[in-house]
A protein has these predicted regions:
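N-terminal accessory interaction module
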Residues: 1-68
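Basic helix-extension-helix modules of the SAP/HeH family
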Residues: 70-135
Length: 135
């Protein structure tokens, strides 16, 4: 069964809205004057749109090519010390060390999200990509 990796829509004026977590309701008043919204994070997709000016569904799922998944998936981080405001980092920009730390410490994450991180490390190995910590 396919699972959501990135819950997002594109409004008629080209604005991308992305809901990162459950009940993360994100809205935008489009250039056409209509309000659009997306909600649900990786758990469900709820959108608010208009029949006469529809949005584009830009969701990414586990069944999509991994090259799309690694660009679209974002992980919320509170910084190394855990005291920073949450910052959503795209998977393809995360350091190797950060991904390994998530796999070693975040045992609560769903299997399909764990698989995304494992696949990213494999992708980097196969494509000779390494992102090191700057500190």
């Amino acid at each position: 069964m396919r699972k959501i990796i990135a819950n997002r829509i594109i409004t008629p004026d080209g604005t991308m809205l992305q809901s990162f977590s459950t009940h993360d309701f994100v809205k935008h008043t489009d250039a056409n004057g209509k309000t659009y919204a997306v909600d649900g994070g990786l758990d469900y997709q709820r959108t608010f749109w208009h029949e006469d000016a529809p949005h584009t569904d830009a969701c990414v799922y586990t069944t999509d090519p991994f090259t799309e998944i690694r660009q679209a998936f974002c992980w919320g981080s509170y910084g190394k010390d855990g005291k920073q405001p949450i910052h959503w980092k795209p998977l393809h920009t995360m350091t190797d060390e950060h991904i390994k730390a998530i796999l070693e410490t975040q045992h609560h994450i769903p299997w399909h999200i764990r698989g995304v991180f494992e696949n990213e490390l494999e992708y980097r190995h196969e494509n000779n990509i390494s992102i090191k910590d700057s500190e």
